[in-house]
Amino acid sequence: MANRPSFEQPVAYWTEELISPGGLIPFTNSYAFRDANTGLAFLYYWMTQILFHQCIESLHRAIYQPVIDAYPNMWPDLPFDLQIDLNRYQHGRMFAADICRGLDSVLHDTVQPDMLIMPMTVAMDLYRDINSVSQDGLMEIMWIDNFRSRLIEKGQHVAGVLQSQTWSEVATF
């Protein structure tokens, strides 16, 4: 009570980040896009980067899987130009965090919340994979579950607005 914020004594900057809508743990700085289409383009870019990196990793595992049965040399010798630098494809968690930082902004600006399901699902799957291996990413999973409820609420709101309109108004909408 003694530290209640007022005009003379504003909230300390470290607590303001926690109570502002953009300062939700574990993603403290939300992105704000120029418009919903720009935000959606970024979300889908980050989503495809995650999927592409996972594809490269699985190809790398398949190529370098030891061949024990028929060959005396169980590790394949690939030419230098076919060598893959796997460190270039280890940024999935960063891309998933970028998706989560942008989801709220795009949800606020869009009238098509269903377009956010795929990026949200890809980020959720990545964090679940991380959590199954290392018990990390639980806060991120909880944040995405919370976002899913906001996404459902926005979808129901848009559906309610469309159902309350007459068909001629929907056609011009």
Please describe what each predicted stretch is:
Residues M1-F173:
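C-terminal effector modules of eukaryotic transcription factors
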